[in-house]
């Protein structure tokens, strides 16, 4: 039984049978709610009224239920040939159902390429089961993914919240404290980096609906539920999450990622992709790649996936080299303050007449050159985002 694909064998304390009987799973990282998704494969289950159902769920009475996809914590089913259903064995959030139940979100995003839920079942406030109109799994292109994610996030931009770097950095610390990597990384983030409501799309969850491609929105991972807060993340964070899945699961190369990025960039606010917003010394894309790999590391521990764990560990070792480079840049940045201090010394030396006017001007000019040169070199050597 513990061989179920959704079972967190790497951190589970209670047994699968105990967890399904009680609806609570005890893990090394804390307790979570869970349920036996297999019961909804029986047609009799659909005939029973359900307390925490919403939308059309209680109206459904399928005669045929077929599993289309098992993907870790997610199970995709086809109900007759009329609907599809997505079940989470461990419900992790209500972000997907909120797209239907929150009227301003629904009206804001209705013109995008999202596939909206039309019914569902909640467990302790999170999405256990979601119903969607009938659709068929399909493949798509980096152009479509970049444009679709960009359009979604651009619609959410007016609802953005201010830079929340303190909690974003705490999010990293929480993962580091539990996973004990040999890396520690924090970022100041540009002021233009803001939080938005989370809409997560995945390249394996793209559907064809009567000839139109749609992205089925997914909830957060189990490790994020257990180890991270609920704060909003920047649009760049979800872009990097999707980038990670394109590389990890679709084998995208750097040219395809560049195409994906350009189509996303064209559709989001320009300030999100400004030089400072993408600057590695301020966090930029690389800090969110670091976050994404920490989550991958956590998921590999959670599911006991050794190959994925080794891949994450290899990437984290490369972070040390990047951090060493950033350390050198911080030394160059200190030259700005050396230059400013030199100019201050020149001014007071002139005031106190300990240096002649010409010598003071020369010293001040040298300080200015040191400051400007250090700043220019600092930004010139900033590692590129791509």
PLM features per residue range, with description:
Residues 273-291:
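All-alpha amphipathic helical-bundle segments outside canonical DNA-binding/catalytic cores
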Residues 346-348, 368-381:
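Alpha-helical transmembrane segments
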Residues 228-272, 290-308:
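Active-site activation/catalytic loop segments of kinase-like enzymes and analogous catalytic loops
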Residues 194-219:
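Conserved protein kinase catalytic/activation segment
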């Amino acid at each position: 039984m513990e061989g179920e694909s959704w079972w967190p064998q790497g951190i589970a304390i209670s047994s699968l049978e105990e967890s399904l009987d009680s609806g609570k799973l005890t893990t090394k990282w804390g307790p979570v709610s869970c349920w036996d998704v297999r019961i909804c494969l029986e047609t009799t289950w659909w005939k029973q009224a359900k307390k925490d159902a919403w939308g059309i769920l209680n109206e459904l009475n399928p005669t045929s239920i077929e599993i289309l996809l098992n993907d870790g914590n997610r199970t995709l089913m086809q109900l007759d040939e009329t609907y599809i259903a997505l079940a989470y064995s461990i419900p992790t959030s209500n972000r997907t159902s909120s797209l239907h139940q929150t009227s301003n979100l629904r009206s804001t995003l209705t013109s995008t390429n999202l596939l909206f839920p039309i019914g569902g079942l909640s467990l302790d406030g999170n999405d256990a089961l979601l119903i969607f109109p009938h659709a068929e799994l399909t493949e798509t292109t980096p152009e479509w993914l970049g444009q679709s994610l960009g359009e979604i996030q651009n619609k959410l931009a007016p609802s953005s919240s201010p830079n929340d770097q303190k909690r974003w950095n705490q999010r990293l610390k929480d993962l580091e404290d539990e996973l004990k990597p040999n890396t520690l990384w924090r970022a100041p983030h540009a002021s233009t980096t803001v939080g938005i409501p989370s809409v997560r799309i995945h390249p394996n969850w793209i559907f064809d609906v009567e000839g139109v491609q749609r992205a089925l929105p997914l909830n957060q991972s189990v490790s994020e539920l257990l180890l991270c807060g609920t704060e909003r993340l920047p649009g760049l964070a979800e872009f990097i999450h999707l980038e990670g899945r394109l590389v990890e699961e679709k084998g995208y190369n750097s040219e395809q990622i560049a195409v994906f990025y350009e189509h996303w960039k064209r559709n989001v606010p320009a300030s999100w992709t400004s030089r400072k917003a993408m600057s590695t010394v301020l966090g930029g894309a690389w800090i969110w790649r670091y976050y994404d790999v920490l989550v991958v590391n956590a998921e590999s521990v959670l599911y006991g996936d050794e190959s994925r764990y080794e891949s994450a560990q290899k990437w984290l070792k490369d972070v040390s080299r990047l951090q060493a480079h950033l350390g050198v840049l911080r030394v160059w940045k200190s030259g700005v303050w050396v230059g400013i201090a030199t100019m201050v010394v020149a001014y007071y030396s002139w005031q106190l007449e300990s240096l002649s006017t010409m010598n003071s001007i020369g010293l001040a000019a040298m300080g200015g050159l040191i400051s400007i040169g250090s700043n220019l070199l600092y930004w010139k050597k900033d590692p590129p985002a791509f």
